[in-house]
Structures are given as structure tokens and as C-alpha cells.
Amino acid sequence: MEEKKFPMGGCLPEEKDIRDYKLKAGVVSEAALPEEFVFGVNVPVKNQGAVNSCVAHAMSSILETHLGDVESDDKTLSTNFIYGTQKLLHGHTGEGMYLRDACATALKYGDMVYDDCPGNIEVPDCYESAEAALNVPSKTEKAYNYRINRYFSCNSPAEIKYAIYNYGPVLAALNWSYSFYVDDEGILRTDDEKPEYCGGHAIMVIGWTKDGFLCQNSWGEDWGLNGKFILPYTMSFTEARGIEDYDNRLDEEDDPIKEPLLVATLKIVYMIINKILNFFKGRGQTK
């Protein structure tokens, strides 16, 4: 059992949302995936300390993997920006964060480099510094370079594998128990027949082996297997989000991501409204 009690409950449970994108039916069943796979870009293991910012840590790590292996001073991204702006951007107050909110922030704003919004601060103290950074145009313009294109729900282990293989690391959550430990092979274990769960925890899923999913945690390199662990297939994630970067988009004809019905319907409505407006605008110009 882990001696050090890291914060739990930092990943808040979400309800289903009809606006969520998901993978099209049949895409995963037709995909030929290897028995084992690990995403090829390594990023440093972060340490959230006693702050309930696991979602922001996992999200910023995923964005860092999108930068590739290129050496850059701007390669360390902020966790405080994602965690500290959620009150202003999404209306959530209190410790912890939703996966969807972190994805929505990365979709609209990207993420700031660490020096533009430094620190790892718990709410409510993180709000002031993060919101102040958001009001600096030069910082938000730079953050926009790290924006994602889309995110989508992964509703099965097969969909998580497909997302990692085609798009890169997945943002995921699981219920955590303090009875969990990592064995010598790096596999997450518990000796309790019915473990007592103490809250949700977010991690970055970077691949899979024959034993389970390879995950990168945010509790420092001294935890687990150099900061990582394998979640066995007998355990499961509570939710997961695939992340599409601008550099890993597929052609529109081969696009495996399904647009939610609500979004597709609204597009049709907007198209009809625009046609009507343009019709009357054209009639006015011919008079």
C-alpha cells in the first residue's frame, strides 16, 4: 500500500452529454492494431503534489506530447492555466476538475507555456493568477499555438487503443483506492477483494501491453515504475477522451470521428437560415 497519501477526488465524475463527439460505428472493429503499442514521444513526469489538479496535469502532458521531440524553451506547458481558469471559463468552483472542461479549454485557448502561468496552486488561490494571465494578449496568442482540433469520447478499451494508435495519448480517469500499489512489473494491484475507493483520478494513457494499459501518472518519478504504471485489463477506466491535434487529422473522407447529432442538426439549421437571409439580401439589392 502507498505510504504517501496523494490527493484523491481531483477528477470529478461527468454525466453523458449529447454534444460529445465519438468514434463512428464499425471503425474500431475494422482497425488492425498491434498486440502492444507505446506512443513514441516521451515527456517528463509531472508532480501535482497535494493539489487536486490531476486533470490539468494529464491534459498539459498530452499537449506536450503533441510538440514532438523538438527541443524548445516553450515545451513545458502550464497546469495552473488549465486548472485556474475553470471558474471563469466553465463556472466550476471547488477542488478538482472535469475531463470535459480541460478538453474544452485546450480546444478554445490551448495552453500557456509554464513561464506565462507558473505554479501549481489549489483553488481558490489559483484563480487570480490564471485569470490575470488570460487577460494578457501576448500570452493568450502564444497559448493558441497549443490548441487542439477536437476531442471525443472513448467508450471501450478497443476505442482507447484506436485513439492512442491514431491520435496519441488519451486523457482518462479511474476510481482510485489507497489499497492500490504497483508491483515489480509495473502493474497496478490491490490485495483487497472489494477495495474502498476514495475518489476519481486522471492520468495520461500512452499505450498498452499484453497486461493492460500503460499510463503516466502525475505523482513524480519516484512513484510507481518511474512515474508510470500498467492498468490491468481486469480494471477499467471510468471515462476517457481521445485528443485530435491539428497535425494528426485524417482526411475528411476517412474521418473516423462522428459529429454529435445536435451539432449536425444545428449546422443544417444555420445553413438554412443563412440561405434565407442571403435570399432576402439579394432581393433587396435588385430593387
Name the predicted role of every residue range:
Residues 36-50:
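Asp/Glu-centered strand-loop micro-motifs enriched in Gly/Pro and often flanked by an aromatic residue
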